[in-house]
Amino acid sequence: MCPVWLLVAVVVVGGSRGAVSQCWEHPSCQELNSDSSMMECIQLCHSDLTAEKPVIPGNAHLQPPPLPDPSSSSSFILPSSSSSSSSPQSKRSYSMEHFRWGKPVGRKRRPVKVYTSNGVEEESAEVFPGEMRRRELASELLAAAEEEEEKAQEVMAEEEEEQKQLLQEKKDGSYKMKHFRWSGPPASKRYGGFMKSWDERSQRPLLTLFKNVINKDGQQQK
């Protein structure tokens, strides 16, 4: 009976005295004679009593902590370790890609390529609206510059044609200084009127000149 009493002492140390006394007074445990059967009976009775233990009302910190179950503790420890190992990975993989500031500054986002029906790749304007706007402005400026160049080339071609026509006219006809005022003056005004013919001029000034000379000679002789 010594092992039985040792078992009872261990149970008394591990549990409360009221529960052990209840299990010892239980008729199913009193009818047993072997040590192993009595040990099993006391363990079963103690587990039943602890399962039926009432919850003490009041603050949660004043209630006694629940007894840990070895089978359940291992099952709880494994998920926690797995969750702790998976939590950094999940936090690491999460990134706010739906915001523009979700990515770090040094890392550039790749533009989304849209394949049109013609098979040409076009970048979506939702990813980089500023960049797309700048490209549109650059294309507009290039188109305006090309139009100005075309107009300048047309003007130069017209000027060259006019110069060719002028050269052809000079070769065919006589040279006329149309860009001077005296290019084509009337005959009466050429050289101040000294180049008139004898018929065109009046003979009265010459006659008066002769008369004046004769009169002067007569006066000197007197």
Swiss-Prot record:
Q: Where is the composition biased (Low complexity)?
A: 70-93
Region described as Disordered: 56-98, 148-170
Sorted keywords for this record are:
Cleavage on pair of basic residues, Endorphin, Hormone, Secreted, Signal
The entry lists its GO molecular-function terms as: neuropeptide hormone activity
The record's similarity note reads: Belongs to the POMC family.
Per the UniProt record, the source organism is Thunnus obesus (Bigeye tuna)
Q: What is this protein called?
A: Pro-opiomelanocortin
Compositional bias (Acidic residues) at which positions? 148-162
Cellular localisation = Secreted
Q: Key word Cytoplasm present in the record? A: no
